[in-house]
């Protein structure tokens, strides 16, 4: 049923893409059910200080930094399929152990293992998808993957919100086991794929070619800013703020993430079409503006609890459209900037910027949230606005054939 639904999202892609996207949707269901409530579990249920819980989240991302480098190198040399399967196996075993996490050091250890796993399955996933589709269709395939992921995330978030209760630790343990099972299920889908032929004619220089590409480094800097100040805060810290400051219940938090996913499902492929023939830097600048608007609304919700849920709904809507634009542009831009034979290394570097954002965002954000919540959201909005200005300045420095999303 999932395969049929994903297949109807966009025609003219290889069947193997639909198999992969179906696995993505299944895995996203488990992630959507568990991830928004991890910090709430560590802080509100297990009594771990918010700063320490944020450090555990940052350790997750730190574990993914080195794993991303290794995973992409393996993807370039022997193909991405084995890398993805190894990461999924580690994630499955770690989430099966997560119900036994009760202290800060255990949470930090589990976070590091999950980050290492993500360095394999999440970053290798992009290489696998890009190898399964022709270049002119990549932005559609990545947009479709985003839709598939949000189908799972939305339903999972709603399910998690209905199950989770801070008064009963067992409800969170159910979510973690559910997430482990969906990681294992995703592995079954990946195992069905015919592994793409590994590119053994890798361009000499490896990461030296990446660090010498100044326009690409500029794109990565903007990416770090957006992930740090927007994406990393949405799943990790916004639910804690919504519950403890705005006074929103767990079920309503899950419903907010369902709205986030439904909006992305409805708009992602349409936005992927809209950005065709348009400059990618302008699209990313608009992303930053929408992210900033989201956090200013979240800040307002904390000072207007009577209308807090409605304001958060408006905030999550702005974030959703920003995410649609970001996902339609970001990964295809990275692939188009990469020389032949180095797509894996470039995607690895983009994965590092993502992981670095998740190191900085939760660690600093959790500390700010504990001390001065308003400063967190105001500062995040300012960073997003600065990122929008910075990406516009990069436009003329990018290769001509990478500046515009191709038409299909």
Please provide the spans of the model-predicted regions.
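C-terminal membrane-cytosol helix-exit motif in multi-pass small-molecule transporters
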Residues: 161, 181-199, 390-395
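Helix-loop boundary and gating motifs at the non-cytosolic
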Residues: 11-61, 215-260
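Juxtamembrane intracellular "pre-TM" segments in multi-pass secondary transporters
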Residues: 1-14, 193-225, 408
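Helix-to-loop junctions at the C-terminal end of transmembrane segments
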Residues: 67-79, 266-281, 369
